[in-house]
Amino acid sequence: MNTKEYILDQFKTYPHLELEDLMKFLYQSTFGCEHLVSDQDTVKKHIQQEFDTQMDSCNSIEYLDGDYVRLHLNYGLSVNTLSTLFILSSQQEKNGIKQLEDKIQILLELISNHTLPFSLEESTNILLKWKEDGYPAIHHSNTFNQMYHPSYRLIHKKYVPFLELFKYIDDKHPSILLIDGRCASGKTTLGILLKQVYDCNVFKMDDFFLQPHQRTNKRLESPGENVDHERFEQEVLIPLSKHEDVNLSKFNCSTMSIQSPSLIPYKPFNIIEGSYSMHSNLQKYYDFSVFLTLNKEEQIERLKKRNPNMLNNFIQRWIPLEELYFNAFSIQDKCNILIDTSKA
């Protein structure tokens, strides 16, 4: 959708809106929640107050004309999760004024040709005054508040693919959550995000590459056997299943040896992240499993940006090995949820 279509969709969704509501829509589309963010305790307090008093029955995700969405409080996220995503979404927008003024021009054109039922002269004066004042943040009109009882927070649209996962975590409180999937699909990025949102440990399969003596032709030719899942089970999953601390010994690729162990205190919520982590010998330990995927074109583009010198190695070796593992054990079908990150 383009700016014109977004504006008309707003009018269709909220037929009683006023000009200032469209101004707010354009402001939010451009600047997101940058002007609203304070400390997390204050943000959480305000969200909790809205939870307790809100009359908004909408539970949808409302896309804006830019990088943000309106996530209505009734969607189902906890106060802590929503407040954290809200704060993570705040950022300084480059060229924001230029973007906003381009959108305002389209709004005026829709008013000028009578597509929108507002006075052109009055609207022009209001918008010029807004510009003179430096484009301050706009409130919803009294009419909009009375008719629609809006209750939402702005978050970046890159978090939308993971909202159902956040909702599951908030509702079910899993102890061990798995993230497997295709290379460059965002497994590490999701693990980092979950650690920002929740009090959890993240354990990576990349720390459990095979030691030199394990790299036999027989093993490397077997689907899913090119990681040390045996050591991962003993060092990480068995202690976690017993609610015990983990003595983590990472494999160092530069020295091709295992490092000295470091103590990871037990936490009730733990993330297992990486390719081959859904190995058939490990599945019994997981409360919930996520499979991340993406289209081939996006995968190649991300790998090229990550390390162009390694691209051919991924195409010729690592991607075929992953696909062999996925197909041999129906990994995608066995995971609880599939998330396509192609557009994330």
What do the predicted segments below correspond to?
Residues M147-K172:
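N-terminal pre-Walker A segment at the start of P-loop NTPase domains
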Residues H173-L177, K267:
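Pre-Walker A (Motif I) flank of P-loop NTPase domains
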